[in-house]
């Protein structure tokens, strides 16, 4: 299927020469940098919003030449306008990152250097502390019997329990768990490591507890749909790929029954995995590897070690071990 073309900026505020370079830049990010579709969409939106602001600010179309000649005051005015629209610090940081990425692309292509962006400091952003779910409650999310009163087929209970067990038991992102193929999960007695594809299509080895594997195999045995080796292991009621929204809704219903706050989400199970490992003596760098964080600073909000060390830390520290 052909890839969707990125929308050009509004021609009322931006000339065709800069619009064409934006399309080339986004194509480069997709093909060479392998950024996620959501990141590409956000970057494209941020740059378009900047061009719309500049077009109104200058009362003329923004050309490539005009963009290269930006003054620091122009960027500060754009950021101030975004703040006035109640845009938060993290979104402003992303906007600035997108503009800088586009500027670097123009410079590499020999189209000029946007010096104004180098004079702008990134907005300060307070670090948000993840809210882990209590250990006993986190385990209950992976217990299919907690949903015994629901009018659902037992295989769906088993499926949801297996997914949530992976989020808490192996610290996977919801996209990583739902992206697993049947062949990615070892059959009974054939190992306890998953090869997970994370952000940027990077793969990592992730240990998986035997009781989590047992839940996955129980679901597979109960599933009425065909699960070919190259297809997704987790499927929806009609046999298609399972959507993250389904698991989010399941957790929303369960957290109400368990008396948990709205912060008890699929991603909170991943946070809980890291927090509970760390509280039991897990090594910070080992947890970084398990989570697939590119930078230790990301892990330090709560979380090159060899695979045997990862397995040892995991088996020793995880509360489900």
Curated annotation (Swiss-Prot):
Main location: cytoplasm
Residue ranges constituting the Core-binding (CB) domain according to the UniProt record: 16-107
HAMAP family: Recomb_XerC_XerD
Transmembrane intervals: none
The keyword DNA-binding belongs to this UniProt entry's keyword annotation: yes
Name of the protein this chain belongs to: Tyrosine recombinase XerC
Function: Site-specific tyrosine recombinase, which acts by catalyzing the cutting and rejoining of the recombining DNA molecules. The XerC-XerD complex is essential to convert dimers of the bacterial chromosome into monomers to permit their segregation at cell division. It also contributes to the segregational stability of plasmids.
Keyword tRNA-binding recorded: no
Taxon lineage: Bacteria, Pseudomonadati, Pseudomonadota, Alphaproteobacteria, Hyphomicrobiales
Listed PANTHER family: PHAGE INTEGRASE-RELATED, TYROSINE RECOMBINASE XERD
Organism: Nitrobacter winogradskyi (strain ATCC 25391 / DSM 10237 / CIP 104748 / NCIMB 11846 / Nb-255)
Every Tyr recombinase domain range: 128-315
UniProt xrefs under InterPro entries: CB, DNA_brk_join_enz, Integrase-like_cat_sf, Integrase_catalytic, Integrase_recombinase_N, Integrase_SAM-like_N, Tyrosine_recombinase_XerC/XerD, Tyrosine_recombinase_XerCD
Active site feature: 173, 199, 267, 270, 293, 302 (o-(3'-phospho-dna)-tyrosine intermediate)
Origin: domain of life: Bacteria
Subunit structure: Forms a cyclic heterotetrameric complex composed of two molecules of XerC and two molecules of XerD.
A GO biological-process term: chromosome segregation
Family: Belongs to the 'phage' integrase family. XerC subfamily.
